[in-house]
């Protein structure tokens, strides 16, 4: 009676223990799986969000693995300018920023073509503009003789062609376009949306584009004159939907959200040091003056672009981040001191 329990009793005890074990373990296994799914597939966060605050961010660029920015650069054959770029999804799970850096020859003239394209509603519009805008521009019959007209017409033509290509899509997509065209000693900056162009001239940080926002008085008036409206929905939005007042695409709002670029021209002389083109992933957290001060001592434009990208990421930018820098080499000054904020700079 007091010997070893019979085998069935041992089996019964084991079965009872298993049931107790399962009772406590199963919910924990389920909870663990839920946590894994939530962490891995958490919407709105990049696959690299977990690097924040860890020692990996102390590396030279503050990124690791899939978080490393795409970067590169080059030098024009005539030696008059160099360029660099850096681009990364940042804290976003998807990438909707695109960029273009291109050196071409037209009628014996060396042409520099640089652009940043920040998509919304997906990447389709930004990718299309990257692939077609500059190709359309250099084929324009007035490209050399009347370059400003050529730029304006090409922006609108490319927008129209994209909208035709979008006819089968039910979801709207759009894109900003901040571009710089370098022809001889002329720098022409054309902008649609809220990507921004800033130059450093003689130490001054000067915005050479305007962020197109629907709460600007002239933009709001244009939208309302066209039959649209602007309302507050977290920020001022066209039709309560779109936070920029000009863009490529956005076919459902096209009557109000135009692709007419604002174009500014700068003369390339010894006082013009460099140009920064960037998406709002940079400008949301770094002022024009701060960006110029960071770039000015760095002669390699690729390293300068990576420096700005790193700074925006570490300051908590919630968006994709793309930076293109063009440094003008002929007769430029290369001071390393802090820049002066120009009076005309309204976007700092």
Curated annotation (Swiss-Prot):
Offer a single GO CC term for the protein. membrane
Q: Where is the PPM-type phosphatase domain?
A: 82-328
Where, by residue number, does Mn(2+) 2 bind? Answer: 118, 280, 319
Where does it primarily localize? membrane
What Gene Ontology terms for biological process does this UniProt record contain? regulation of intracellular signal transduction
UniProt keywords, alphabetically: Hydrolase, Magnesium, Manganese, Membrane, Metal-binding, Protein phosphatase, Transmembrane, Transmembrane helix
Catalytic reactions on record: O-phospho-L-seryl-[protein] + H2O = L-seryl-[protein] + phosphate; O-phospho-L-threonyl-[protein] + H2O = L-threonyl-[protein] + phosphate
Enumerate the InterPro entries for this protein: PP2C (IPR015655), PP2C_BS (IPR000222), PPM-type-like_dom_sf (IPR036457), PPM-type_phosphatase-like_dom (IPR001932)
Q: What class of enzyme is it?
A: hydrolase
Gene Ontology molecular function, alphabetical:
metal ion binding; protein serine/threonine phosphatase activity
Q: Which cofactor does it need?
A: Mg(2+); Mn(2+)
> Is the Ribosomal protein keyword given for this protein?
no
> To which protein family does this belong?
Belongs to the PP2C family.
Q: What is this protein's name? A: Probable protein phosphatase 2C 10
């Amino acid at each position: 009676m007091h010997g070893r329990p019979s085998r069935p009793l041992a089996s019964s005890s084991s079965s009872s223990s298993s049931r107790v074990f399962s009772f406590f373990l199963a919910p924990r296994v389920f909870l663990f799986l839920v946590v894994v799914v939530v962490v891995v597939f958490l919407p709105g966060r990049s696959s690299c969000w977990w690097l924040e605050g860890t020692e990996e961010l102390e590396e030279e660029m503050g990124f690791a693995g899939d978080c490393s920015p795409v970067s590169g650069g080059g030098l024009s054959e005539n030696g008059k300018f160099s360029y660099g770029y850096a681009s990364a999804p940042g804290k976003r799970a998807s990438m909707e920023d695109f960029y273009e850096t291109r050196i071409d020859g037209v009628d014996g003239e060396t042409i520099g073509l640089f652009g940043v394209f920040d998509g919304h509603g997906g990447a389709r519009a930004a990718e299309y503009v990257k692939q077609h805008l500059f190709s359309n521009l250099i084929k324009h019959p007035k490209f050399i003789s009347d370059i400003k007209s050529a730029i304006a017409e090409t922006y609108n033509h490319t927008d129209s062609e994209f909208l035709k290509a979008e006819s089968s899509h039910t979801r709207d997509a759009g894109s900003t376009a901040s571009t710089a065209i370098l022809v001889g000693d002329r720098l022409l900056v054309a902008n649609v949306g809220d990507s921004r162009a800033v130059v450093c001239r003689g130490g001054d940080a000067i915005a050479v584009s305007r962020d197109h926002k629907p709460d600007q008085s002239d933009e709001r008036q244009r939208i309302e004159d066209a039959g649209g409206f602007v309302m507050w929905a977290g920020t001022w939005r066209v039709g309560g939907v779109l936070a920029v007042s000009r863009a490529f695409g956005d076919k459902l709002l096209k009557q109000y959200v135009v692709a007419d670029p604002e174009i500014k021209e700068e003369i390339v002389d010894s006082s013009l040091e460099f140009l920064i083109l960037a998406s709002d992933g940079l400008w949301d957290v770094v002022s024009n003056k701060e960006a110029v001060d960071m770039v000015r001592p760095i002669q390699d434009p690729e390293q300068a672009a990576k420096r700005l990208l790193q700074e925006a990421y570490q300051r908590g930018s919630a968006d994709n981040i793309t930076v293109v820098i063009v440094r003008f080499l002929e007769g430029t000054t290369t001071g390393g001191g802090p820049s002066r904020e120009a009076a005309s700079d309204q976007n700092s």
